[in-house]
């Protein structure tokens, strides 16, 4: 069963494009871009996820990342 999202592909792709534009503006290498994106993910989890769910969300995020890079 495919995963459904409450967000449109268009909205997701636009945000991705905007983030890429910022990274390109700063001439970020792949290493720097991954550091920035990782820090953003950490900041979002720390700011918006209840303490009791942080580990679970981080594990789900890391598993999704691993699956998407195969």
UniProtKB/Swiss-Prot annotation:
Source organism superkingdom: Bacteria
Pfam families: DUF1414
InterPro entries for the chain: UPF0352, YejL_sf
Family: Belongs to the UPF0352 family.
NCBIfam families according to UniProt: PRK13689.1
UniProt xrefs under HAMAP family: UPF0352
Protein name according to UniProt: UPF0352 protein PBPRA2586
Origin species: Photobacterium profundum (strain SS9)
